[in-house]
Amino acid sequence: MLEKVVIANRGEIALRILRACKELGIKTVAVHSTADRELKHVLLADETVCIGPAQSAKSYLNIPAIIAAAEVTCADAIHPGYGFLSENADFAEQVESSGFIFIGPTADVIRLMGDKVSAINAMKKAGVPCVPGSDGPLSSDIAKNKEIAKRIGYPIIIKASGGGGGRGMRVVRSEDTLEESIAMTKAEAKAAFNNDMVYMEKYLENPRHVEIQVLADTHGNAVYLAERDCSMQRRHQKVVEEAPAPGITEEVRRDIGSRCAKACVEIGYRGAGTFEFLYENGEFYFIEMNTRIQVEHPVTEMITGVDLVKEQLRIASGLPISFKQEDIKVKGHAVECRINAEDPKTFLPSPGKVVHLHSPGGLGVRWDSHIYAGYTVPPHYDSMIAKLITYGDVREVAIRRMQNALSETIIDGIKTNIPLHDLILDDENFQKGGTNIHYLEKKLGMHE
C-alpha cells in the first residue's frame, strides 16, 4: 500500500481524498495556495506545503512546485483530484519521470483520450458506439466537407478537437452556413486551445447525458459500475446528477457497460474513469472519456457500495480491484445537488465569509463539503462549496429526501444556488425522469 500521498487539489475533493487515505492508513500531504491556509483538509493533513499565491496558475497549476512538495515530504504518489492538472498528460508524465506514482492513467492514455479525434477512433475500434461523424479532422476542402455533412445529415455540429466544457463548438443547420461555421470554429479553437483542428458530428437535438463509471487495474481487470444521468445542465455545467439513469434496463446497462470495460482493457486504462455518452431514442453515442475521478462519483458509491477513491488508491498501490464484476449489484437510487456560492438569479459567484452553517442529516443523506462556520469562500476558484447527496430505495424517496435535506440546509453570509435546486426538484418533468440536456436552460428561460 502507498505510504504517503500528495493531494494536489483543494476544496471538497481534497477532503474526500484525505478521508480515503486516512481509512487506508496512508499519510497525507496537503499542498495549498496562500488563500487556502484555512481549508478543512489543510488543517487535517499530516503535512502541509504552501505552493504559491492565490492564482491557480501560480499554485494548483504550478507543476514544479507540486513535484517539489512531493520531493521534500518524501511522498510516494500524487492524487490530482478533478479539474486543475487531473487530465494534463504532461503533468502525469513529469510526476512519473520524477519517481512518483500518478494516481490515474498513464500519460499516453490521457493524451489518447484527451484528443477527441483519437479518442473516438480508439472507441470505434473497441466497439463502443459513437456519434456518426467525419472520422477525423476536417480538411480545407469545402466540397469534401459538404459531402461529409450530407452523408451525416443536417443538423451537424463542428467541434474543436482540443475543446471541452462547451467551448469550441458550433451547430450548423444547412449547407449555406457550413463554410463560415468551420472557419469560425477553427479560429476560436486556435485562440482558446492553440489547436485549430476541428471535426464534424451529427447534432442530436434532444439527447440525455448518460455516463458509465469504470475502474481498471494493472492486472488486466476492468469493471463498470452502472451509469449516471447528468442531463440537468446549464451552459454545459452539470447541476443535478443521479444514479442509476431513469429508464435504463439491466440488459442495456450490461451491454454498454461491458463494452466500456472491454475498451479499458484494450487501451491499457488504469484507475477510475468515466465514459460520457449522449443518449437519444434508446441509442448511446460516445462523446468523451474523463480520465479522472468525477465530481458526481458519490451517487455511484451510494448505489453500489464501492468507495471509488479508496479503489483509486489501491490500484495505484499495484493491487487488483477488490471485487469482481458479478459482485456489483445496483441497489436503490441516489441524487446529487451541486451547491455553489453564487447568486441563484444571475449565477454570478458570491464569495465571502460563511457566518452560520447547518448541514443536513438523517438516513440516506450525505454532505460532502469543506466549508464550516467562519470559513471564507475565496474569489479565485470554482464556486462549488458542497455536494448534497441523498439515497433512497426508490427514486421518489431519494428526491423527497433531497427536498427535505435542502430545506434543512442553512448557509448564511453568502448566496447559494439552493433556490435553483428547489425549483428543479419541484419540477414535474424532473420528477417523472428522463429530461434532456436542454431542459434546464429552457426552463430558466421561462423563469427569467
Can you say where each PLM-predicted feature lies in the sequence?
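N-terminal phosphate-binding caps/lids of nucleotide- and nucleic-acid-binding domains
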Residues: 122, 154, 167, 187, ...
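ATP-binding N-terminal substructure of ATP-dependent carboxylate-amine bond-forming enzymes
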Residues: 1-125, 135-147, 397
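Structural detector of well-ordered beta-strand residues that form the stable sheet scaffold
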Residues: 29, 79, 101-103, 131, ...
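A structural signal for short, well-ordered beta-strand elements
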Residues: 59, 112, 138, 171, ...
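ATP-dependent carboxylate activation and anion-phosphoryl transfer catalytic cores
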Residues: 7-16, 20-24, 48, 71-73, ...
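Acidic/histidine-enriched active-site and ligand-binding environments that engage anionic O-linkages
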Residues: 148-157
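Conserved short loop/turn motifs at secondary-structure junctions
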Residues: 81-84, 106-110, 134-138, 166-171, ...
